[in-house]
Amino acid sequence: MRLYIRAKTDSLHAPEIVVFEKTEHLCQQKKMKDMENTSIINGRRIASDRIAELGENEIFVFGSNIHGAHGGGAARYAHQKFGAEWGVGEGLTGHTYALPTMEGDASLKQAVEHFIACAKAHPELTFLVTAVGCGIAGYTPDEVAPLFREAAPLENVYLPRVFWEVL
């Protein structure tokens, strides 16, 4: 989108050109920020281990508990920084997607299946998956990564490096 300021100009000023250049510069900065959150290596879409800001269509995917009490780890960060709603333990809120990881293997498997369905239904969004379940919940990447096997070919899903090492 290009923005222009309509104003009277004289031979010394060209506000449309100046505004256009600033807008282009800001767009380039935004694209660079988005690229910091992701990388593609050997066809693998990798989510950064450190996500400080999100692009407009980026979604921070984190592990939670079913009650949505985002009190620690990535859940707390998602709540404070990216708009994860307190009380929502699964699904899209703000610029986040909560995956309940504290309720057991069967529950986690089903939640990942729901996530994959959501990612397929929303190709306009880019999902940056953290190492869900591998912190406070106590799982290892060897246990969780296989649940994301069906997400691996999706072009809008970026998995953490530790999951790709297993897949």
Please provide the spans of the model-predicted regions.
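Catalytic zinc-binding patch centered on the HExxH motif and its immediate surroundings
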Residues: 2
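Macrodomain-like recognition of ADP-ribose-binding/processing modules
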Residues: 31-167
